């Protein structure tokens, strides 16, 4: 009987410990052990750019998803849980009846669907509005999903994107599809193994994009990246290191050889 009581007491202690570990912060919606409130902006950051994040249902349940960092940091952002973009998503996203702003969507370039870099787009946009003191705000559409799902989402959204006159843009850093991605231990900003070299999280992609197109872009990018770095720092304590794939190691070795030859 005494042994049974002792077992019950141990079980209750375990349940209390588990409950304590599962306690969620009311502000950032993350477990208390990895709360990010100390790095989140005290006030949501305003942007001229209207940001729409099409959030794949599977990705929204992933514990390492970075879209919540954006919705907790930016004022002018809308998260839409869906597998494809619909007309109503962009017609009512801003909540106004004003004409739709110039629209861009962030996705890597491909031979069949080329994209302009965000820096090139910024130069073209400034050139087109050089006689206007206050250029119209932009609308940025981002697809948050795994690489496979994101490609499916973009393809399923092509009609609406085309009707909106959306321009496909990519980050200045190119994606190398011939190389497997790295891990959290290869970068301060990567949370999990990416499919290709050059891939980044949604939060970093949006931060880099806003850094290029917003008037106060550098400061906005710095704030968002600091939040992401802290999230990665926390998560790295609980993630098991993964060895880079052979293709990635081979690519790094090839890149190092020219540098070593130059030094000789």
From Swiss-Prot:
Q: Where does Zn(2+) bind?
A: 25, 28, 35, 37
Chemical reaction(s) catalysed: a uridine in tRNA + S-adenosyl-L-methionine = a 3-[(3S)-3-amino-3-carboxypropyl]uridine in tRNA + S-methyl-5'-thioadenosine + H(+)
Specify residue ranges for compositional bias: Polar residues. Answer: 254-264
Q: What is its EC number?
A: 2.5.1.25
Alphabetized, the UniProt keywords read:
Metal-binding, S-adenosyl-L-methionine, Transferase, tRNA processing, Zinc
SMART domains documented for this protein = DTW
Q: Give start-end ranges for the coiled-coil region(s).
A: none
Cell division found in the keyword field: no
What GO MF terms are annotated?
Answer: metal ion binding; tRNA-uridine aminocarboxypropyltransferase activity
Result of mutating residue 144 to A? Loss of activity
* Domain notes per entry: Contains 1 DXTW motif.
Summarize the protein's role.
Catalyzes the formation of 3-(3-amino-3-carboxypropyl)uridine (acp3U) at position 20a in the D-loop of several cytoplasmic tRNAs (acp3U(20a)).
What is the designated name of this protein?
tRNA-uridine aminocarboxypropyltransferase A
Q: Gene behind this chain? A: DTWD2A
